[in-house]
Amino acid sequence: MEDDDRPRKYPKLNHDEVQEGSEPVMTGAVGAVHDDDAESADSDNRASPSNDRIDNDVKQACDEEGQDAHGKDGPPTLSKNQLKKLKRKEHWEAMREQRKVKRKEKLVAKRERRRAALEQAKQEGAEATEETRKAFESTQKKFQRSTLLPVTLVLDCSYDDLMLDKERVSLGAQITRSYSDNSRAPFRSHLVVSSFNKLLKERFDTVLGKTHENWKGVRFLQEDFAEAAEMAKEWMQGPKGGQLAGVFADKADAKPEDGEIVYLSSDSPNILTELKPYSTYIIGGLVDKNRHKGICYKSAVAKGIKTAKLPIGEYIQMAHRQVLATNHVVEIMIRWLELGDWGKAFIQVIPQRKGGKLKSADHESEDQTPRESVEAVEAEPDGEGAAAEAGEGGKE
């Protein structure tokens, strides 16, 4: 056969053998490859694996740095986690009106239960009616009947930047519950929220609608816990500093200079045995799922402040580690001011899921089921409903 009669061979692609007389095929190609484009197609095909890796690396870097793959000047991109958070936030905002409706429905149901309970009490007599009325008193009326003692509880919120958004939301709900419990207690303390100057304050000012500005008997300070404790010495000695009543009734000779400042921490080697008049007790406002163990204790030691832990191990057999939420610690302290008994205070406050049981036989006759109401903070992790309720009570 003459050379001119032989069919022209097509160039091989990807080193694959092509049968003579057959049409060359490229994997993934849509149309035929012309002679002029064969060489460039072959080059592009060989370079694609490395290009894919480069694109992936660039995309990953952009996700980390918030930059677009086309350059630093491009619009920022979001990672998958950021997109999920954004969607959850959008969903949360979209459901705001529905949550408001549900809160109103709960309020109506609560009023109906109150009315039914009063009707039932009237049938049982005047004494039962009076007890029922007291049980349903508003926060303001309970606050007016409550006796202020010369003791201060400081919630240290200086760890704002160490928490995740959801943890900050949880802390906001715990502060709300702490305020509510203290306001309704028969014997209440001075309550202070220190280092209230970061993202937590922003949440209270925006999402929670500044309802905390209507709260009574609580101070929100930008100063840290050490400065707040020094300020507490002055107002506890003032004309509205509180009475030596309740558990302090037998300490009429107590002097302001005998008071102390104690930072409560489960990491402390010291055990708190009692609360003293004209003293300030600091509680770490930190929700961190054990990422920053011992940080509250270290903060107190660094400022030369005494530390102590609640005597939980002396009275309660715990199934889990002895770390409680901020509002639980506050309520335990308030219960002690009312009862003067750590065992009773612990068993009334510590959540049942922590498996707490009294060690002492002297308390076996007491109700060993912790109150369900302390779980309300976790039932409403957003804290919006709790803050609204507390704000409403403060304005009445």
Swiss-Prot record:
Domain of life: Eukaryota
Basic and acidic residues bias: start-end ranges: 1-18, 52-73, 359-374
InterPro entries xrefs: MT_TRM10-typ, MT_TRM10-typ_sf, tRNA_m1G_MeTrfase_euk, tRNA_MeTrfase_TRMD/TRM10
Catalytic center residues: 288
Chain ranges of the SAM-dependent MTase TRM10-type domain: 139-357
EC number assigned by the record: 2.1.1.221
Catalytic activity: guanosine(9) in tRNA + S-adenosyl-L-methionine = N(1)-methylguanosine(9) in tRNA + S-adenosyl-L-homocysteine + H(+)
GO molecular function term, any single one: tRNA (guanosine(9)-N1)-methyltransferase activity
Pfam families for this protein: tRNA_m1G_MT
Gene Ontology biological process terms, A to Z: tRNA N1-guanine methylation
Biological role stated in the UniProt entry: S-adenosyl-L-methionine-dependent guanine N(1)-methyltransferase that catalyzes the formation of N(1)-methylguanine at position 9 (m1G9) in cytoplasmic tRNA.
PANTHER family: TRNA (GUANINE-9-) METHYLTRANSFERASE, TRNA METHYLTRANSFERASE 10 HOMOLOG A
Family: Belongs to the class IV-like SAM-binding methyltransferase superfamily. TRM10 family.
Subunit and partners: Monomer.
Protein name, as recorded: tRNA (guanine(9)-N1)-methyltransferase
Species of provenance: Aspergillus fumigatus (strain ATCC MYA-4609 / CBS 101355 / FGSC A1100 / Af293) (Neosartorya fumigata)
